[in-house]
């Protein structure tokens, strides 16, 4: 798009599913957030260092262990939290998932998934690395779910929950109650 009146296709890549949101990680990397072929939320890291031959370098599907999943970050970019760092970036994605579990229909689970993008200075080595998840009250993930990151601190605000914890131990995030 260097000449907006004459856009050109310099390269292309066919991938299963689609991306609703593309986020620039670096000049050579793009992060896609969208839907997989199974219609589950997915994060996909694209290496565009060679624009004529972009590649999908890393893929994570959220809620893949159950029958359905969705993320409000697919339609509301403010639901995605992204903290850029020199070597490693951090991001969080809220999502809900559910289905048949042990023959019982249909429990649902609401979560915040935490990821790091590592190796971003060397695009060929960059990866999306799962860090952990914060469990929320079922039915609490919606378009207003937010995460605030401050160094190692982690704060989650949803329709029902207000939690705090640490990036290094997200599973231990606990409810914050006023005194």
Report residues per predicted region.
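Feature marking well-ordered beta-strand scaffolds used for ligand recognition
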Residues: 1-179
